Amino acid sequence: MSMTTPIVDFVRSYAQSGTARLHMPGHKGQSLLGFEPLDITEIRGADELYAPEGIIAESEANATRLFGTAHSYYSTEGSSQCIRAMLFLALQGAPQSGKRPVLLAARNAHKALLYAAALLDFDIRWLWPSAQAEGALCSCPVTAEALTGALHALAQQGISPFGVYVTSPDYLGGVQDIPALAAVCRAQGVPLLVDNAHGAYLRFLPLNCHPIAQGAAMCCDSAHKTLPVVTGGAYLHLGHNAPVQDEAAVRGALALFGSTSPSYLILQSLDACNAVLAGDYPRRLAQCCAALEGLRRSLNKAAAVRQCPVPLAVAGTQQEPMKLTLDAAALGCTGTVLAEALRCAQMECEYADPRYVVLMFTPENPPQDYTRLQTALEQLLAAVPAGLPCPENRAGEFAALQQQAVQRCTIRQAVLGAQVRVPVHKALGRVCAMPTVSCPPAIPVAVSGEEITPAAIALMQRYGIEELSVLR
């Protein structure tokens, strides 16, 4: 498929024109780091991100065709901007009841959701992981039955949520059953909103499993996480079932949460990516996923030979194909120890916690990256002692967190209130102010406005959180 790159073409032409730059930015195209000649602002012909009529409009139309959406909008400020805009639009599109707006959301949400709740002043009712789920901060699998039950429970309280919000894929690579959740939302007349920050590439697999294709009303993609796009490049995708379709309203929502000086370096990267996606990238993507599946099988076969208590590589139909998530319990160590061992072998992971290590691959990783990783892990497997115990199921910790959770004030009141930092061990009974998270994965243990409970303190200490902000 042939694909134009109008933003790239315009900026390159301007950079080569010799025009005197009597406008921002202050570097005037003079190279300090090398990219400055291509770094421009919204001059004549460069279009305007939040009111495009020219090259940006053309480029976004290209992205819309590639993703098969009703409309795909660019963001130069990551999925965080898109999440806020998406929630703003869902609020705008919801029937006005005169009551406080409520969002039904899976608990493993990024802190951007809490910031949006503070800014837009809505409440959140949480979907928690089931008692059968493996306990992990990053995971919250939601079944269609659980969602149906939660919606019915809210209806009995006279609450009609303005949206259902899930994160899929999550930080450990787990994916929700989006078609089943979308069917429930469609039957209940509630839009399904998906934080698909880690799944932009899903559209380009042999079997399209992008959230919009599977029935979500809106979703955000961090292009920079899994596609060849520089940091900050993202999309807000609308399906044909999105509650708001008016283009001006969507751009207004993005502008509300975005800078008036969008990066043209990021816009060029998004534009250039269209041509890549229209070329042989899907083929290379399939090859990458196949190589990772082969690596998973090889590692798990080696782990079985060593009689490890669990598979080394997390696998299954509910795992996305382009993350390699390692269960350090297979080696008898913590995820942070395993990450340090890989670091000593000149490999930097995406994320590590007490149990897991997350490694992110794309088609841009050369073959030697796979070889280096496999060699290092096989050496670690060879040193595994016999008779390692099975890891403890930590689901009870999250069940306790759910049972003890009490919301003492709204998220907005907590985030905007007077705050003080205290050690975690002195926070019992205080009210969480700003969410205390590590980044990655930026998922809060205690939510703003919640009382700090014994279960919350235990989890914070397990995940290495030493201080948090509480209301004075």
Predicted regions mapped to residue ranges:
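Short active-site oxyanion
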Residues: 70-72, 99-103, 445
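Short, glycine-/Ser/Thr-/acidic-enriched flexible segments
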Residues: 29, 171, 225-226, 241-243, ...
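N-terminal "arm"/small-domain region of PLP-dependent enzymes with the aminotransferase-like
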Residues: 1-54, 190
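Conserved N-terminal alpha-helix of the aminotransferase class I/II PLP-enzyme fold
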Residues: 36-81
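Generic beta-strand/beta-sheet core signal
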Residues: 106, 127, 167, 195, ...
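Conserved C-terminal alpha-helix-loop-beta "cap" of PLP-dependent enzymes
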Residues: 300, 304-448, 454, 459-463
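Terminal helix/beta-alpha structural elements that buttress the NAD(P)+-binding lobe
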Residues: 467
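Conserved PLP-enzyme active-site core in the AAT-like
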Residues: 3-12, 78-311
